[in-house]
């Protein structure tokens, strides 16, 4: 945040958007998380829940919150698009080797075959409009 703060002029805005799937509200999301943890036990991005959003600690003293919006919504996926969404998370593509990713993909595809081709996954969306102090 200090670098972003440095780039912006006083009063300029910085928008943070977070889109977390909710594993405790979706069997598919929960099973996908368990599979990520099987291949990457150190992954810290699991277990997200609905929560009251607040300005990140790293932004305190640098930005004021002009507006914070948070809401839950169901997002439609196909097996392929959900697999892509999960693969893009830092627990898989940013952390595993190519060989591990291939194994994970095969197992995830097999797991998703147990469900309809199209489904919805609940997500918690947070949008923070921060203003440089």
Role assignments for model-derived ranges:
Residues 5, 9-75:
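Conserved catalytic/acceptor-binding region of the Class I
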Residues 1:
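A short SAM/SAH-binding and catalytic strip from SAM-dependent methyltransferases
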Residues 50-133:
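Conserved Class I S-adenosyl-L-methionine
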């Amino acid at each position: 945040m200090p670098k972003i703060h440095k780039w912006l002029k006083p009063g300029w805005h910085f928008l943070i958007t977070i889109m977390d799937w909710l594993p405790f509200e979706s069997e598919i999301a929960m099973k996908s998380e368990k599979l990520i943890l099987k291949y990457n036990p150190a992954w810290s991005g699991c277990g997200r829940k609905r929560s009251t959003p607040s300005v990140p600690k790293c932004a305190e003293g640098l930005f004021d919150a002009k507006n914070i919006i948070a809401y839950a919504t169901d997002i439609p996926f196909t097996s392929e698009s959900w697999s892509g969404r999960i693969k893009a998370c830092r627990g898989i593509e940013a952390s595993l080797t190519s060989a591990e990713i291939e194994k994970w993909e095969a197992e995830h595809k097999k797991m998703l075959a147990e469900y309809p081709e199209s489904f919805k996954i609940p997500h918690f969306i947070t949008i923070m409009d921060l203003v440089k102090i």
